[in-house]
From Swiss-Prot:
Reaction catalyzed: N(6)-[(R)-lipoyl]-L-lysyl-[glycine-cleavage complex H protein] + glycine + H(+) = N(6)-[(R)-S(8)-aminomethyldihydrolipoyl]-L-lysyl-[glycine-cleavage complex H protein] + CO2
UniProt gene name: gcvP
Protein name: Glycine dehydrogenase (decarboxylating)
UniProt family annotation: Belongs to the GcvP family.
Mitochondrion found in the keyword field: no
GO molecular function annotations of the record: glycine binding; glycine dehydrogenase (decarboxylating) activity; pyridoxal phosphate binding
Organism the protein comes from: Gluconobacter oxydans (strain 621H)
Length: 951
């Protein structure tokens, strides 16, 4: 090689480019796609799509992209700065054993983690069954009639229980009582939730401080945060006598041995299923639960799986009672819950299927026995054990020696809980060993103590309370007995996965949901113990890796969005909305503007927006949209004038839910600011802005970022999610974690999935992120252009282009021949596709978002399917086929249809193979569901199907 060769060419360039794998269309296809959409280049497309006033192509400071290998090495280096000690901190978070068969075949399986929320039930039967197992598990443990399919975490579940108690209780009081022996993070979340709604939170001893006539409900801890187990029956009876509601915060492992809340008289039971096989993960994600009485089912928050029947009369699962939810009831919804924790609920349910009732009893009994031995040994050493009746946790008064005890425990590799005032808490779990117990004894005894004699002399009795042992049978349904060998369980999980459609099989073109690639490299770090086995309240000097990770994400999210500060605490987009509105509320109140309580929300907004505004104590005022789907600026001006001096905020989604960049967004922001309000820009559609526009620089004051959309955390069949918020510097003092504001139980929300988004940003870099946004916009316009001659595209921007999604109008087809959006959605299943978003934001339409990850071949396959369906509708329009005889009305077609008697007006091939015979064809496991029948005959736990259907 010549010696004078320029040094820049000495070393060969990297051959790996992650962005080219993340982005679907190949460079050779882009020219044809641009020709179809009518743009001369990608830059031309962006110039004609994004308003010039906000377009920003400059580098955002993210830096150059890393390869997958380099990004994983960087994350490994970050993880190595976390110290994995044995955690006995407790406080609602415990070490646990995730069975490897569940880790590999659920948590690490894209058939499970890339699925969407099961709103299309026919293609979601597998995860619906797993979630029904979860509901059955919770209902059994709690002894209550009905349980939901998960909430975000225990703290928010308790806040939801408070809200439910206020809705269903007979008391007219405005105060809610909280047991002082409740986890402190839960109390903080409850206080945050209550304050904007005008409810007082009274914290005290329920046996001495509770005046049942002065509260609408009470939260009792069972067991308490200290570990103490108290019989709540007298307190519950006193509450009921005054028309108040009794809620119990429970430990689901303790409920294996303790009497169920339902048997004790409780109306609501809540808790976290984390210790059923889900790692602590520095706070999450974990599936919380709520169970309640049948009478309250229509007021319960969160998703609810029920049993219905399909078109052949066979049992099938679906999401039930959806009229409770935010996407329908908006500000009148029971909650703003949207994303829940489906994947984690499924893991917890499989943990119960794996162990069965006998295994759970053995784990619970061993855990209690370890705690009893620990307590007895400490008493022998002369320690003052405050907790006398307990399941797994004890509290010791160590006085002035507490710091030394805690330090000696850390030196031996164990974290105990500093409970304050010289008190030390310690919790046992299924991973606790005799060596752990001995090390704790040694921490209390000090150096040189001989513990062998103590161990030999111990006479340990159980410390479970008399009269509170579980009396009801546990987990009697066959599903908790039928899959006990690993072979059987493996095949059961595979059979469930095969029933569903997820991103590993097909495009999921759901508008406003951003179902993009969840790259395998991004997922790998979440199971590393340095991320997974960290307690959220571990000492700061042990979690320097997480501190570095949080700082990286806060910096890059600020750079991407143009904001000045970020909070990572909200663990869903809806929680992010709520947190952002609380920040706005705090800002106004600090300035003496308590009267600012009006939240302006466009008619096209996500259902979570009005629900979140109501939770933040604001009044929702709807702003009209014009015929082009944009905010009607004249109506906005009128509403501002009508509510002069009271405007707190506007919540606006950008690009709009109609799939266009509104040209007047800067003017809208200026109008609201001139009226003294703040601009909440919903980040649900941020995938159309990253690298090309920054909300914080064109007028917005706060946004949430759906990390499970734009930044590649998978949807998990309905969760987990993350919804961090970015704010301008004037709102930074009011972020969660400051001034006592807590919207989630853990300080950094679902911290263990943050490496996914960090890896994505690292591997894309500035240019890759910009390319991803550009290609998302190209893909949406390509679909709009290909479908335009067959279905009207409802909204386009000023220059005739859509943003990252498009809306096709199907209403005229219903008017003409009676074909519904459901008919087309179900017919798409026969073509192997998940339907787009149905009837939102406009009834009778599809909202289609392909994302940047889908290649031209898959886009064409989808468009070909939609065009073929339009041809079938044309047959009905021409009178050659009656609508009731059309394959559209019988879709989806099942293997039972194919093999059974065929008395239909079209051929088997036309019905079952609309795209031609395909050896890899997806078959719906059930026919079309009868939704109304399912709500009329509600069953939300594993039923005896045969008798149920006959009945």
């Amino acid at each position: 090689m010549p010696e004078n060769l320029p040094v820049t060419t000495l070393w060969p360039a990297q051959t790996e480019d992650f962005s080219s794998r993340h982005i679907g269309p190949r460079p050779s296809e882009i020219g044809e796609m641009l020709r179809v959409v009518g743009a001369s280049s990608l830059d031309d497309l962006i110039d004609k799509t994004i308003p010039a006033a906000i377009l920003d192509r400059g580098d955002h400071g993210i830096g150059a992209a890393l390869t997958e290998q380099d990004a994983l090495a960087r994350l490994r280096q970050i993880a190595s700065r976390n110290q994995v000690l044995t955690s006995m901190i407790g406080q609602g978070y415990y070490d646990t054993v995730l069975p490897p068969v569940i880790q590999r075949n659920i948590l690490e399986n894209p058939a499970w983690y890339t699925a969407y929320t099961p709103y299309q039930p026919e293609i979601s039967q597998g995860r619906l069954e797993a979630l029904l197992n979860f509901q059955t598990l919770v209902a059994d443990l709690t002894g209550l009639d009905i349980a939901n399919a998960s909430l975000l975490d225990e703290g928010t579940a308790c806040a939801e229980a408070m809200a439910l108690a206020q809705r269903v209780g007979k008391s007219k009081a405005t105060a809610f009582f909280v047991d002082a022996d409740t986890h402190p993070q839960t109390i903080a979340v409850i206080r945050t939730r209550a304050e904007p709604l005008g409810w007082d939170v009274v914290v005290g001893d329920p046996e001495t401080d509770l005046d049942a006539s002065s509260v609408f409900g009470a939260l009792l801890s069972y067991p308490g945060s200290s570990g103490q187990v108290r019989d709540p029956r007298k307190v519950i009876a006193a509450l009921h006598e005054k028309g108040a509601i009794a809620a119990l915060a429970c430990d689901p492992l303790a409920l294996v041995l303790l009497e169920s809340p339902g048997a004790l008289g409780a109306d609501i039971a809540i808790g976290s299923m984390q210790r059923y096989g889900v790692p602590m993960g520095a706070g999450g994600p974990h599936a919380a639960f709520m169970a309640t009485r049948d009478a309250f089912k229509r007021h319960m928050p969160g998703r609810l799986v029920g049993v219905s029947r399909d078109s052949a009369g066979k049992p099938a699962y679906r999401l039930a009672l959806q009229t409770r939810e935010q996407h329908i009831r908006r500000e009148k919804a029971t909650s703003n819950i949207c994303t829940a924790q489906a994947l984690l609920a499924i893991i917890a349910s499989m943990y119960a299927v794996y162990h069965g009732p006998e295994g759970l009893k053995a784990i619970a009994a061993r855990t209690h026995r370890m705690a009893a031995i620990l307590s007895a040994g400490l008493k022998t050493l002369g320690a003052t054990v405050e907790t006398d009746v307990f399941f797994d946790t004890i509290t010791v008064q160590a006085g002035a020696s507490a710091p030394q005890v805690l330090a000696r425990a850390v030196a031996s590799g164990i974290n105990l809980r500093d409970a304050g005032d010289g008190r030390i808490g310690m919790s046992c779990d299924e991973t606790t060993t005799p060596e752990t117990i001995r090390a704790v004894w040694a921490a209390f005894a000090g150096e040189g103590a001989d513990l062998s004699a103590i161990e030999q002399a111990l006479d340990v009795a159980d410390a479970l309370p008399e009269g509170l042992s579980r009396t009801a049978p546990l987990l009697t349904h066959p599903v908790f007995h039928a899959h006990r060998s690993e072979t059987d369980l493996l095949r059961y999980m595979r059979a469930l996965a095969d029933k569903d459609l997820a991103l590993d099989r097909t495009m999921i073109p759901l508008g406003s949901c951003t179902m993009k690639l969840n790259a395998t490299a991004e997922m790998i770090p979440i199971t590393w113990p340095e991320f997974a086995r960290i307690h959220p309240f571990a000492p700061a000097d042990q979690v320097q890796g997480y501190t570095e990770l949080f700082a990286y994400l806060e910096r890059t999210l600020c750079a991407i969005s143009g904001y000045d500060a970020v909070s990572l605490q909200p663990n869903s987009g809806a929680q992010g909305e709520y947190a952002g509105l609380l920040a706005i509320r705090g800002y106004h109140r600090a300035r003496g503007d308590e009267n600012r309580d009006v939240c302006l929300i466009p008619a096209s907004a996500h259902g979570t927006n009005p629900a979140s505004a109501q939770m933040a104590g604001m009044r929702v005022v709807v702003v009209a949209c014009d015929e082009n789907g944009n905010v009607d600026v004249e109506d906005l001006k009128a509403k501002i004038a009508q509510h002069d001096g009271r405007v707190a905020a506007i919540m606006i989604t950008y690009p709009s839910t109609h799939g266009v960049f509104e040209e007047r967004i800067v003017e809208i922001c200026e109008l609201v600011h001139a009226a003294g309000g703040q601009v909440y820009l919903d980040g649900a559609n941020l995938n159309a802005q990253v690298g090309l526009a920054r909300p914080g620089l064109y007028g917005a004051d706060v946004s949430h970022f759906n990390l499970h959309k734009t930044f590649c955390i998978p949807h998990g069949g309905g969760g987990p999610g993350m919804g961090p918020i970015g704010v301008g510097k004037h709102l930074a003092p009011y972020l969660p974690g400051r001034h006592g504001i807590a919207v989630s139980a853990a300080p950094f929300g679902s911290a263990s999935i943050l490496p996914i988004s960090a890896a994505y940003i690292m591997m894309m870099g500035d240019e890759g992120l910009r390319q991803a946004t550009t290609m998302a916009i190209l893909n949406a316009n390509y679909i709009a252009s290909r479908l335009e001659g067959h279905y009207p595209v409802l909204y386009r921007g000023t220059n005739g282009f859509t943003a990252h999604e498009c809306i096709v109008d199907l209403r005229s087809l219903k008017d003409a021949v009676g074909v519904t959006v459901d008919d087309i959605a179900k017919r798409l299943i026969d073509h192997g596709f998940h339907a787009p978003t149905v009837s939102f934001p406009v009834a009778g339409t599809f909202m289609i978002e392909p994302t940047e990850s889908e290649g031209k071949g898959e886009l064409d396959r989808f468009c070909d399917a939609m065009i073929a369906i339009r041809a079938e509708i044309a047959e009905v329009e021409a009178g050659r086929v009656g609508m009731e005889d059309s394959p559209l009305r019988f879709a989806p077609h099942t293997t039972a249809d194919l093999a059974g008697d065929w008395e239909r007006s079209y051929s088997r091939e036309a019905g079952c193979f609309p795209g031609g015979v395909d050896t890899a064809k997806y078959w719906s496991p059930v026919g079309r569901l009868d939704n109304a029948w399912g709500d009329r005959n509600l069953v939300c736990s594993c039923p005896d199907i045969s008798t149920y259907v006959e009945g």
